[in-house]
């Protein structure tokens, strides 16, 4: 008999339903100890894998600004592909079992010398964060708290929009644009990242992001990235998610907690 135990971003399949693992803390163990901890629990075989999260709305909920067809291809094929490929990689090497997604990304970034698992792990996280950075009826201006912080750090919401848009349009090739909270400076900043890289690797706290890989907008906007970004800011971005993330980010920064909060 087998059971499935769910932890943050990770699922564990265990060959005995009487055994339950909850948020295993294996990071302080050596690789050899971690393998022994996972594989030698009374002869049980433990397998870890990451699941494909569903966007927090129906696939047609963002229409007409982002079509159901885009979600079917982007989430259903591209995003699923990153999850599947990551699981295949982890299945070949159990040294990374037990990591949360955030821990996995930081570990596999390897101080700028990425391990093979990094790209797929980061893309799984990036896409989860992107879907949760949008909502039906989104756009417009942020709520008071977020707006005040944007005004403080960028001078005005208009200045923020211009900087965010410019970052998206000048990101050459594939990548992402993020609004992040810088931990040390305790201020908001717009950053752009190439390919799969995300702000977690620099210990920044992401607040919102937009995907500027071509597959994220080509079905709806062809090669008109400017129209896609303008639509994202006017009709799609979830300032509700941003407000929630900001509140948690500020709490983590003020309390000095080591973990990065996500939506």
Swiss-Prot record:
Presequence range in chain numbering: 1-41
Cofactor: binding details: Binds 1 Fe cation per subunit.
Keyword field: Chloroplast, Iron, Metal-binding, Oxidoreductase, Plastid, Thylakoid, Transit peptide
Pfam families: Sod_Fe_C, Sod_Fe_N
UniProt EC number: 1.15.1.1
Subcellular location: Plastid, Chloroplast thylakoid
Binding site for Fe cation: 74, 127, 211, 215
CC cofactor: Fe cation
GO cellular component term, pick one: chloroplast nucleoid
Enzyme class: oxidoreductase
One GO MF term: superoxide dismutase activity
Assigned protein family: Belongs to the iron/manganese superoxide dismutase family.
Protein task: Destroys superoxide anion radicals which are normally produced within the cells and which are toxic to biological systems. Plays important role in chloroplast development, particularly in the maintenance of thylakoids membranes. Seems to act as a heterodimer with FSD2.
Subunit organization: Homodimer. Heterodimer with FSD2. Interacts with MRL7.
Name of the protein described by the UniProt record: Superoxide dismutase [Fe] 3, chloroplastic
């Amino acid at each position: 008999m087998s059971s499935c135990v769910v932890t943050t971003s990770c699922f564990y399949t265990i060959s005995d339903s009487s055994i339950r693992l909850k948020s295993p803390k294996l990071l302080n163990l050596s690789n050899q100890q971690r393998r022994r901890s996972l594989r030698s629990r009374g002869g049980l075989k433990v397998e870890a894998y990451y699941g494909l999260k569903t966007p927090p709305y129906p696939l047609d909920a963002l229409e007409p600004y982002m079509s159901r067809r885009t979600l079917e291809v982007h989430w259903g094929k591209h995003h699923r592909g990153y999850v599947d490929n990551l699981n295949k990689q982890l299945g070949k090497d159990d040294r990374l079992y037990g990591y949360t997604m955030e821990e996995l990304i930081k570990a596999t970034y390897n101080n700028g010398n990425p391990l093979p698992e990094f790209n797929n792990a980061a893309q799984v996280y990036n896409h989860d964060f992107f879907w949760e950075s949008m909502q039906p009826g989104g756009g417009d201006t942020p709520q008071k708290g977020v707006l005040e912080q944007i005004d403080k750090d960028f001078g005005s919401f208009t200045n923020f929009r211009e900087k965010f848009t410019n970052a998206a349009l000048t990101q050459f090739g594939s990548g992402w644009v993020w609004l992040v909270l810088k931990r040390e400076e305790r201020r908001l900043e717009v950053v752009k990242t190439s390919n799969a890289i995300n702000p977690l690797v620099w210990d920044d706290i992401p607040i919102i992001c937009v995907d500027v890989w071509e597959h994220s907008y080509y079905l709806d906007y062809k090669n008109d990235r400017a129209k896609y970004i303008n639509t994202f800011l006017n009709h799609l971005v979830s300032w509700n998610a941003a407000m929630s993330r900001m509140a948690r980010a500020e709490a983590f920064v003020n309390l000095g907690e080591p973990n990065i909060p996500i939506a």
